[in-house]
């Protein structure tokens, strides 16, 4: 307990000081408590993903080649991200080469459905609802400004998760969206958060199927490919399931 208090109090003091700094310097849209930006460690991890996506495909398996071609934009796919800044920045840095190609209709679609499953303040977005332009956080590298301003799409963003929402509702809503006309491409590349993804695997993998993704968190910048299946029930509702055989760890892992 003493160790926790010793570590906790300086962090609180630093956070309050940063909030005051943002206020007096006219950066009221910034925050240290809420929607924490990408850290230096997170930036390095995202750069690691960017380097991986720039590697030759010569020594990859056929399945890995197929998935990486989707990631780099050689095969049709849609980029989507949580509405939290650290997820958006991770995707923007990791996929910078693809986004800088200026492929037609290629942008990061911001989704409330991918918002982290947590009550912590840093899991609350400070982004406004649909139609807003994104700005760099104070920790973001300058080159992200163009991507955030011109290669993001907030038309489907619904703001912060509602009070009556929960993790399962957002998981289901995301699956519904993947199969909807709003995301018309067959492949979807999602940037999100560790608890959200672990819950996703726990919910949609068969109950009896043992896999590390149900117990461990996906590391920041990690990439895993899978096939999400949809089945219509007799009642007319949809159920979703991850094909266990389709899970392919491409980078980072759990």
For the regions a protein language model found, what residue spans apply to each?
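Generic beta-sheet signal
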Residues: 77, 183-195
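Extended, charge-rich low-complexity interaction segments
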Residues: 136-163, 249-254
């Amino acid at each position: 307990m003493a160790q926790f208090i010793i570590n906790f109090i300086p962090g609180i003091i630093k956070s309050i000081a940063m909030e005051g700094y943002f206020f007096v310097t006219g950066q009221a849209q910034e925050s240290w408590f809420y929607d924490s930006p990408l850290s230096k460690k997170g930036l390095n991890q995202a750069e690691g993903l960017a380097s991986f996506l720039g590697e030759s495909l010569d020594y990859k398996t056929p399945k890995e080649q197929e998935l990486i071609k989707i990631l780099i934009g050689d095969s049709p796919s849609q980029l989507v991200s949580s509405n939290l800044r650290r997820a958006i920045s991770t995707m923007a840095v990791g996929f910078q080469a693809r986004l800088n190609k200026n492929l037609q209709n290629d942008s990061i679609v911001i989704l409330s459905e991918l918002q982290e499953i947590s009550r912590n303040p840093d899991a609350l977005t400070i982004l406004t609802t649909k139609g807003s332009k994104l700005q760099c956080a104070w920790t973001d590298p300058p080159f992200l400004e163009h991507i955030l301003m011109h290669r993001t799409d907030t038309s489907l963003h619904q703001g912060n998760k509602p009070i009556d929402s929960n993790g399962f509702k957002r998981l289901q809503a995301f699956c519904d969206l993947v199969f909807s006309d709003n995301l018309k491409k067959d492949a979807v590349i999602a940037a999100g958060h560790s608890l959200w993804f672990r819950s996703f695997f726990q919910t949609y993998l068969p109950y009896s199927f043992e896999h590390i993704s149900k117990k461990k968190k996906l590391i920041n910048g990690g990439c895993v490919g899978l096939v999400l299946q949809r089945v219509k029930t007799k009642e007319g509702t949809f159920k979703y399931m991850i094909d266990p055989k389709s899970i392919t760890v491409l980078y980072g892992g759990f």
